[in-house]
């Protein structure tokens, strides 16, 4: 699907607009029209064949993304913040749905994912976080995803990952990209919006989704619902664990310190006990590269989904996403790596 087709998909559907609830009817109509125009331009960033965008200037000397001014990106980010705040921290999602893991800044691979799974609104989606960093097109990626979120707020969901945090994306690329192509001010506005994103999703009450994993502090799902926003990601505690923890085999105890230096690793028995307590069929999380794009754990009661193939140009991994159909049958679609990396042995 090319950019023109993406635009048509977006323009055929109503767009969520927080401004539409304010002012006289004429102002609402004008505001909605501006929304349509902006969303369509967002989708027109690049075609699936484009490997790298070429920054342009907006007449003031400020570098801008192809066809999009800083004011328009800022508008998108602020509207998305309002939408996130209007929805719960634990979003409840109906099947059918596609569940996608880390995508980072690999924009053309995102378009490949939509080619395989169906472009919204032909398919419903929940993404498990990590939209920015470790790629040269984080802005294209996060802006297109936010545009879809605004266009289809009840069928397109974005969870927060550990890279949607200022202390992380300041180091791993997103801050530098915002500064180079727009401004530090825009990066700060992205940070404010990331601080309002939901941290977990529940598909038909049976599949619990998050970016990282479980927490020893999580004893009631209402704890997630009660998290106040906006919030940064603390160094420890429930939010930190939902975004940072990992499953691990061959553990001597149920919980151990994570080698990442933050949060925990948890055992198979933790997963099985948690699912039994909350009557869950599956925990679906992301956060770790896996060769096939997905990998089961704890007798298929947890699955890791990773959707960025050839991650960072350092791995030969495939990407994948999970499809949950109307009958709650689960299957996986792989995003094959486009190149084989050379390995040298000494």
From Swiss-Prot:
SMART domains for this protein: PP2Ac
Gene Ontology cellular component annotations, sorted alphabetically: cytoplasm; nucleus
Principal EC category: hydrolase
GO MF terms, alphabetically ordered: metal ion binding; protein serine/threonine phosphatase activity
Record-listed Mn(2+) 2 binding positions: 130, 162, 211, 287
Gene3D superfamilies (alphabetical): 3.60.21.10
Comment on bound cofactor: Binds 2 manganese ions per subunit.
SS bonds (residue pairs): none
Residues forming the catalytic site: 163 (proton donor)
Catalytic activity: O-phospho-L-seryl-[protein] + H2O = L-seryl-[protein] + phosphate; O-phospho-L-threonyl-[protein] + H2O = L-threonyl-[protein] + phosphate
Family per record: Belongs to the PPP phosphatase family. PP-1 subfamily.
Enzyme Commission identifier(s): 3.1.3.16
Disordered as annotated region, ranges: 46-65
CDD domains, A to Z: MPP_PP1_PPKL
Highest taxon in the source lineage: Eukaryota
Keyword annotations of the record: Hydrolase, Manganese, Metal-binding, Protein phosphatase
Other observations noted: Trypanosoma brucei contains two PP1 genes which are highly similar.
Sequence positions that bind Mn(2+) 1: 102, 104, 130
Listed PROSITE patterns: SER_THR_PHOSPHATASE (PS00125)
The keyword Hydrolase belongs to this UniProt entry's keyword annotation: yes
Descriptive protein name: Serine/threonine-protein phosphatase PP1(4.8)
InterPro entries documented for this protein: Calcineurin-like_PHP_ApaH (IPR004843), Metallo-depent_PP-like (IPR029052), PP1_catalytic_subunit (IPR050341), Ser/Thr-sp_prot-phosphatase (IPR006186), STPPase_N (IPR031675)
Cofactor: Mn(2+)
């Amino acid at each position: 699907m090319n950019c023109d087709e993406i635009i048509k998909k977006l323009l055929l559907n109503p767009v969520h607009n927080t401004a539409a609830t304010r002012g006289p009817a004429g102002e609402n109509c004008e505001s909605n029209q501006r929304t349509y125009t902006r969303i369509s331009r967002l989708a027109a960033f690049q075609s699936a064949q484009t490997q790298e965008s070429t920054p342009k200037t907006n007449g003031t000397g400020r570098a801008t993304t192809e066809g999009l001014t800083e004011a328009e990106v800022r508008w998108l980010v602020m509207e998305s913040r309002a939408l996130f705040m209007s929805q719960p921290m634990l979003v409840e999602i109906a099947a059918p749905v596609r569940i996608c893991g880390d995508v980072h800044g690999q924009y053309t691979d995102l378009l490949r994912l939509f080619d395989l799974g169906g472009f919204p609104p032909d398919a419903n989606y929940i993404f498990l976080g990590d939209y920015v960093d470790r790629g040269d097109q984080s802005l294209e990626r996060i802006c297109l995803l936010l545009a879809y979120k605004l266009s289809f707020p009840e069928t397109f969901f974005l969870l927060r990952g550990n890279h949607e945090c200022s202390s992380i994306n300041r180091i791993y690329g997103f801050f530098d990209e915002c500064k180079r192509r727009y401004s530090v001010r825009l990066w700060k506005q992205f940070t404010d919006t990331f601080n309002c994103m939901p941290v977990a999703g529940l598909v038909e009450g049976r599949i619990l989704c998050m970016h990282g994993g479980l927490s020893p502090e999580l004893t009631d799902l209402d704890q997630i619902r009660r998290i106040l926003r906006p919030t940064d990601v603390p160094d420890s505690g429930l939010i930190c664990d939902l975004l940072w923890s990992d499953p691990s085999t061959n553990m001597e105890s149920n919980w151990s310190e994570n080698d990442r230096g933050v949060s925990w690793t948890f055992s198979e028995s933790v997963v099985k006990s948690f699912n039994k307590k909350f009557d869950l069929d599956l925990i679906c999380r992301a956060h770790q590269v896996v060769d096939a794009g997905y990998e089961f754990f704890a007798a298929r009661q947890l699955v890791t989904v990773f959707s960025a193939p050839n991650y960072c140009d350092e791995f030969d991994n495939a990407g994948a996403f999970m499809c949950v159909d109307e009958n709650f049958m689960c299957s996986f679609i792989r995003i094959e790596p486009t190149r084989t990396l050379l390995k040298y042995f000494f």
